[in-house]
A protein has these predicted regions:
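C-terminal end-helix/capping segment
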Residues: 172-194
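Non-transmembrane alpha-helical segments in soluble domains
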Residues: 67, 71, 91-94, 135, ...
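Serine-centered coil/turn micro-motif
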Residues: 7, 84, 149, 174-175, ...
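GST-like fold's C-terminal all-alpha helical module
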Residues: 97-179
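Generic, ordered loop/turn and secondary-structure boundary motif
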Residues: 10, 16, 41, 47, ...
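Short coil/turn segments at secondary-structure boundaries
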Residues: 109, 195-197
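GST-like domain detector, emphasizing the conserved glutathione-binding G-site
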Residues: 1-121
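Generic structural signal for secondary-structure transition and capping sites
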Residues: 75, 102, 143, 189-190
Length: 197
């Protein structure tokens, strides 16, 4: 698995591996998304992480597909429900978490890739708006208190990334979601161990 210690999408896969009992079957190798010399671009032409490189040299990407691959290896239906009545709500919740992570990463790259003072405040506001609307939706309809599926994993990784990169600023205005994350972390093996560093 090509990833980085700070990637929320990589964390999602590491957490899925832990929950599925597959962690010991996967080697994790660092990937530098900003280095054009990194073999990452041969493994995923988009140069994005995570990427799962299989024994035959072929690659699977992105995190949604990798998670489904591992769920399939574990017998299916463990993290992604098979029943359409629960499958599509779970995948929709995961899409909301992925969208929050996408917007947070875009905010991070906007400040990281520009000289000080050159980042676009309009772009930052657009991404911040996506994050805030996503958090508001989650605050209004909290994820499951008992589930450890694709939706809950993805939302928890999104919130963890906001804590890591934006000093937990979201917490003040989303108390119900803060409580949910604390309860999720307490019942989810591997959540603390996969925290971004």
């Amino acid at each position: 698995l090509r990833s980085s210690p700070t990637s929320p999408f990589g964390r999602k896969i590491k957490l899925a591996l832990a929950l599925l009992g597959l962690s010991d079957q996967v080697e994790i190798h660092y990937a530098d998304t900003t280095n054009p010399e990194d073999s990452l671009r041969q493994q995923n032409p988009l140069g994005k992480i995570p990427v799962l490189v299989l024994a035959d040299g072929s690659s699977i990407y992105d995190s949604r597909v990798i998670l489904e691959y591992f769920d399939h290896l574990a017998g299916g239906g463990k993290l992604i429900p098979a029943d359409p009545a629960t499958r599509f709500p779970a995948l929709t919740l995961a899409a909301l978490g992925d969208g929050i992570m996408d917007a947070a990463l875009l905010r991070r790259y906007e400040t990281m890739m520009h000289e000080p003072g050159c980042a676009s405040s309009k772009w930052d506001e657009m991404q911040s708006g996506k994050i805030e609307r996503g958090l508001a939706a989650l605050e209004k309809a909290l994820p499951s208190e008992t589930g450890l599926g694709v939706g809950e994993i993805t939302v928890a990784c999104a919130l963890g990334y906001l804590d890591f990169r934006f000093a937990g600023a979201w917490r003040t205005s989303h108390p119900e979601l803060v409580g949910w994350l604390e309860r999720f972390a307490a019942r989810c093996p591997g959540f603390a161990a996969t925290a971004p560093k």
